[in-house]
């Protein structure tokens, strides 16, 4: 497993929302939530398996996260073990507890859409989003 550096993890912990662009649909970014649990980066589709960005990523397609003036190339792996899914759920509820949508992120139909993100190797991180 490849993971993000400490600065990237800190920035992702602090940011409330990120934009995600899949390589299949590079012209349209979707705003999503991201959490860090045990230094692993997780995302989840509140629309369940219907979310287009989720379908693109779960099919193995690459994507880019945009946040805090950065472009971060990522790839996704299904979070298949129940312990990781539970850790991610706790973090979604903790981080987004003030949002009325937080409970939607831990519904039974959204849990299978939990993805663990990793940096795409050999891709430079761009600090200028514009």
Locations of the language-model features?
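Short low-complexity stretches enriched in small and charged residues
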Residues: 1, 25-33, 68-75, 129-130
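Extreme N-terminal tail/first-helix region
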Residues: 1-19, 125-127
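A generic local structural motif
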Residues: 4-7, 29-30, 102-103
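Aromatic-enriched hydrophobic runs in primary sequence
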Residues: 7-9, 19-24, 40, 67-69, ...
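Short secondary-structure boundary/capping segments
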Residues: 9-10, 33, 105-107
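Short beta-strand segments
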Residues: 14-47, 55
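Short, structured beta-strand-loop surface elements
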Residues: 48-123, 128
């Amino acid at each position: 497993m490849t993971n993000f550096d400490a600065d990237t993890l800190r920035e992702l912990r602090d940011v409330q929302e990120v934009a995600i662009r899949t390589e299949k649909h590079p012209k349209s970014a979707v705003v999503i939530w991201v959490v860090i649990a045990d230094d692993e980066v997780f995302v989840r589709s509140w629309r369940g398996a219907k979310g287009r960005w989720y379908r693109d990523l779960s099919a193995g397609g690459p994507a880019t996260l945009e946040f805090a003036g950065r472009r971060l190339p990522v790839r996704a792996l299904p979070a298949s073990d129940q312990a990781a899914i539970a850790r991610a759920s706790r973090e979604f509820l903790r981080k987004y507890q003030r949002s009325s949508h937080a409970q939607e992120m831990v519904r039974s139909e959204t849990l299978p859409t939990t993805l663990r993100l990793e940096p795409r190797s050999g891709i430079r991180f761009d600090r200028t989003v514009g």
